[in-house]
UniProtKB/Swiss-Prot annotation:
ATP binds at K26, G27, G28, V29, G30, K31, T32, T33, E243, N270. This is ATPase GET3. The gene is GET3. It is found in: Cytoplasm; Endoplasmic reticulum; Golgi apparatus. Its EC number is 3.6.-.-. It comes from Candida albicans (strain SC5314 / ATCC MYA-2876) (Yeast). Homodimer. Component of the Golgi to ER traffic (GET) complex, which is composed of GET1, GET2 and GET3. Within the complex, GET1 and GET2 form a heterotetramer which is stabilized by phosphatidylinositol binding and which binds to the GET3 homodimer. Interacts with the chloride channel protein GEF1.
Amino acid sequence: MDFELEPSLEELIKQDTLKWIFVGGKGGVGKTTTSSSIAVQLALQHPNDEFLLISTDPAHNLSDAFCQKFGKDARKVEGLSNLSCMEIDPEAAMSDLQQQAQQYNNDPNDPLKSIMNDMTGSIPGIDEALSFMEVLKHIKNQKVNESDDSKDKISYRTIIFDTAPTGHTLRFLQLPSTLQKLLGKFQQLSGKLGPMMSMLGGGGQGQQDMFAKLNEVQKNVEEVNEQFTNPDLTTFVCVCISEFLSLYETERMIQELMSYQMDVNSIVVNQLLFADDDENPCKRCVARWKMQKKYLDQMAELYEDYHLVKMPLLGSEIRGVENLKKFSKFLIKPYDPKVDRGIITDLKEQ
């Protein structure tokens, strides 16, 4: 490389075209704090635009991060009027799906209904699928004008995803491509499936409604799949800590993301001690910082063409809008332990 990329997310925050930002990594590395910080900085840097932060992790933490209760519908963040949050609940989505299946046909002997109930209860990764469908539904509702020909007319400038731990996230991101292929095959079979269902006693208006709904879902999935693989519209921010297992997981995730043709060029490293600049560092801190530096050096070598953002370990939890504002500024302006050390003890207890 002839140049070194800035160790910050300033370029990402200021980019005009991004519609989707995914934030993911191993469990316990600070994904929610990082995604919340990115969302806060986007809202601060672009006060005339609306932003949405969505948690797709079944163990939701957004409410804790902002000290404010969120649910399955987008709700404004108190103290930051152009940022909204929502937490997708796969169990509630599962219940809604089964109720919708019952509305199509009340006949308990209908084989199609039996198949649908079995599928919704036993498909591996159904949580991710339902989360994805909830996202699709929300995006459709956000279209400014359904008659507008432009695909990208969504009222939120950017949607940020606080994702589940790595395995769930990778399955979630694989869904657009998988569903696109599956629905395409299902559509090919639908012509033959219709008469067969009629012979078995199913079919009728309910079946037609289901096929119409599948057509609509397929169009939405195709649109999202196009956007997820467009680096101008979508990017993924990896979050890790400076330890072997986290570094290994990050590399595995980056390789998977590249296989999905998804843009990834930013890594946030959390919980760094910067013990070299402590006046009276404890032996444990010095030993741990030595280990962290070893893996930081490996990351710098391995990811020289990535934005590698180094975030400090603070003395208290990062909760509430004001604390997130203070912490998130280091995503834009790299943390300097000689100048910024006050932040470690400056946060207000929530």
